[in-house]
Amino acid sequence: MNIYDFSNKLYTLKDLAALSEYLHGQNCVGISTIKKRLQRGETDLDEIIKPKVKAFTEIDYSPIFYVADFETSSNLETNECGAYLACVVKANFNKGLSTPDSWDVVEPCFDCRYPKDLGDYFYTLYKQAEKRKKKTLIFFHNLGFDFSFARNWESLMGQLMITKSFSDGSNPWRLAFGDGEKVWLEIRCSLKLLHRSVGSIGDMIGHPKLGYDYNEFRLPTDKLEKYDYEYCYNDCKVTACGIMEECKNWFWIKNIKDIPLTFTSFTRKNNKAILSSELEKAWSNYCVDTFPMNFDQYQIMRGVYQGAYTHANTFFRGKLCTLVHSFDVCSDYPSQSTQMDFPDTNGELYVNEPLWNLWNGLYEECIESSLLDDVEAIKMRHVLVSGKMFHGIFTLKNIKIKNYGYNYMPIISASKTKSKDGLGEIEYNKKSHGYKLLEEMVSEYNRLIDNGRIISYDECTIYATEVDIVNILKMYDVESISAECLFLNHAKSSGGINELVERNIIYANMKTALKAISNGKHPDETLLNSIPEKWLSDIKSNAEPKKLAKRYLMLSKNMFNAQYGIDATQLVFGDTLIDEDCITSNTESLSRESFERYYNETMIKLGKERSDRGLFKRVKSSYIVGIYITAYARRHLVLFSHLIFTKTPYIIVYWDTDSAKLYHPNESAVTFNKLLNVVSKFNNGVMERCRKSNHSQVQENKWGLGKFDYEETYAYFTALNSKRYMAFDGELDVKTSGLVQATMKVSVVLDYLYKNSESWLLSFKALMRIMWKTNTMFDQSVSGRTYLDRQNQGKWSDEFGQYCGAVIKNTDYEFKMPMKKGLFWTNEKSACLHYDEVSEYVFGNKLDTERTTFYMFDEGIGIVYYLNGKRNIMFCPCDISKFKHGILLSDSMSDLTEDLA
């Protein structure tokens, strides 16, 4: 037996093959390949066990592309959704570009009742493409959802190939099917490409989306009317036409091969077109040469980016409020990039440095002056740290929210706090508090939290920029701050990163000019020059210039917002995995080796070759700019909220980074006018800041970015926590991470409830109960094999379940058992345990309670949990008759233990 020595460790060929399988999964290499590499004289262990790199041969695309769509029906009682119809249309892309109305080149080509049949049709297209040697494109308008049914595409799934551009970390936006060397069929997400709903696309192209009755629950075995098919085909035609009409806006798109994967790609390519070659080259060189990134700094920056401020006021959670005013910031994130300072170096590293030393004794002066006025804050930074900026890991001792009462909003996310075990271990330990009083929310760490936000803490360690630290000092009393690991940067004022700022100002001016034209006004020459010549020519020659300007306005908004996405895009995602029919990108598994390989070899190497692909990839290395844009947007909200707290009687019942919902229990016309005056004063300060910044010379009355605009007043409003609120004022606005609006229309739910209610208000309250009360949402008749994966896939429990896939909607509240009363039973240990006990009893250490979910089915309990940073799935067969709606009926653990044993 041959023994090989690597770094003083001995391996056999079998050991090396096992190591390759452990590190690379299904892409691993076998013993024969490893043996050949050793015989060639390879000495690097990583090179010996790394996967084979398959060269993908570039082939031409067929000009014929397809758009497919599923029609789904939701069961309100079980929250289960299944497909009952699929339609496909095809179009000639080249003809669509040259035809005034591309609607005429789109034609229906296939429909079926079961997802499996659609998979067979796609396999036929795959074989045709392989025979003709032309790649075929297919679009779904929400591939992340529609691909939930793809596990029934048995004939096609064997050709699935994993490519680097597969997933954005959550849902797939490109699926490649091929023979191992060449890709013959691509399925892409048109929603990622267009950033619009089908209804919005229809309005834009003049072919509106049809109306449809979603109240009726339909199955694949039900007879459908002609209109059902027309509706589905129309959605496909609208999407296909929208793709071609979008591509007409860009002069550099000549054929189907030029269609980018996402809308951000549109913007990246347009950047190169609108900036001079010298500026584009300078910007690309600047990002790479100035910000060489290492793994540790990237992990810190990812931590800094986490911890959004989205939050609901704990004193008003679940309560029905009337006359709630909504204020929204116009292009909050990208507007910050046109006004603020950014780092101009990668940063000098400091370790275990007291923050006071870096701030040269001006700490108190900073607290007193810079937080009172946003303009002063800009000036104070340069006095404070001599024009330096910093980000890193900070330890805060004895922190406590300043204003405990109705009008306070904590901003330190519990998910952003870090344990003392190491840089990579995030400590969540967030309790499922429900509606308990705040005084009861004390954990064993002397931490007081409110719905995932820190109220007080003896000691916590967080990732932050100095902007975040200033935000914290405004909202919290802090005994001391020290920096465990700090990157100190020089702040580049007087224009900041000129290329970045110039690029964003062009988009800002474009948006402002198009808004003026769509309102029948004539913008000045400076603003007009920012509009692309083709767009301006089309508007002038169009019979309805305001309507066309509005269409281009929406496009410019998406481009402007995409700029923030470009800057804040993560540099490296984890490996793409296939697990139980579910395809995910495991961001938790990012290793130092993976980062170094991707960042240094791919981004830097390709960038220095000055290829187009390299230049675009290098733009992503402005990640640090995205971090500061986010921090500035958060500070914008903190300053606004502090003004509301101190200058008005209004209460913020809900906020996210670019909006706030304000409520006054005894409002009058006087108090509302006072509120508007205070908001107006704040907006004037934004204009002053913009004028004093050296990034751009703007006319105050022409620049509307960064202002808090009054949107509307809701007759009824209620919020539970982050990203979960409902508002009603004639039309229902629902934002929730649990109720999927695309598949369970809230208007349908209201109609359903209205039949049993006397008013819309009663319906609204009933919908609150359905959305946010566990015991009204769970139905233990749900049965059938369940795939506990990222999409929570399931199967309909009926006679045609083998043909029709169904998904249980991704949610953070349905089927979720309270942690204190949650039961856990395994085949190895015939016992029921409290959740707090099971962590160490079964797994040996604490589970991540924030991301552990229990799912109940007739056959037993499914658990999706995270352990040591990895997602695991366990299904425990057991008798769930002792449960009702996820709540333990009996307090006697011994009774249940005997039953299950």
Located regions from the model:
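Short active-site loop/helix that positions an aromatic residue
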Residues: 147-156, 244, 330-345, 666
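A short acidic-Thr-Gly-centered motif at the start of a beta-strand
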Residues: 53-64, 126-131, 302-325, 642-646
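Conserved DEDDh/DEDDy metal-dependent 3′-5′ exonuclease domain
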Residues: 98-220, 224, 230-238
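C-terminal, non-catalytic extensions of nucleic-acid polymerases
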Residues: 247-316, 400-652, 662-901
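Acidic, Mg2+-coordinating catalytic module of metal-dependent nucleases/exonucleases
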Residues: 199-285, 637, 658
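Short alpha-helical "recognition helix" segments of helix-turn-helix
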Residues: 16-23, 901
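Short, basic interhelical loop/turn and adjoining N-cap
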Residues: 21-36
